Amino acid sequence: MQIDPSHYQIAVEQAQAVAAAARSCRCRRRGRRADLDALVVSKENRENAAHSASSADAQYQQAIAALDARSSTLERSRVVAPVDGYITNLQTFKGNYAVAGQAKLAIVDSHSFWVYGYFEETKLPRVKIGAPAEMRLMSGGVMKGHVESISRGIYDRDNPQSRDLVRT
């Protein structure tokens, strides 16, 4: 997903220009301080030149920090999934705004599917941990896996009698 980067790109370019100007000012003030050190001038002039050079160093560091922040923001305008997978629960459309902390979609890792099944106890005699499992999808496909665990007394949202059971 790509957030329009044009605003962020402009901010990076502006920060680059400010950093370049600060670097130039820093070089000029350092040069002035070095020139004064070689000349016979008052202590006050030397101190002023040293303070001016220190101030230019600080302004340059501040400009570099601002550039780093703008670059980081530009990088974040491109949202990349942490895993290969499938997008589900997509709740966004072209032109929508992204809001920090508000989920707009979910990603199902294509290398790690989990299926929770609800079975009545009378239909469990062959279900054992580690046993192969096969699931027939409504689309006609078949998924294969294995039984990882068995739990008892699981909450079933479709069964009103299970409202007091542990929810998983």
Curated annotation (Swiss-Prot):
Pfam families: HlyD_D23
Domain of life: Bacteria
InterPro entries found in the cross-reference section: CusB_D23 (IPR032317), MFP_Efflux_Pump (IPR050393)
Function: Involved in the resistance (detoxification) of the fungal toxin fusaric acid.
PANTHER family referenced in this protein's UniProt entry, alphabetically: P-HYDROXYBENZOIC ACID EFFLUX PUMP SUBUNIT AAEA, P-HYDROXYBENZOIC ACID EFFLUX PUMP SUBUNIT AAEA-RELATED
Full protein name: Fusaric acid resistance protein FusE
Biological source species: Burkholderia cepacia (Pseudomonas cepacia)
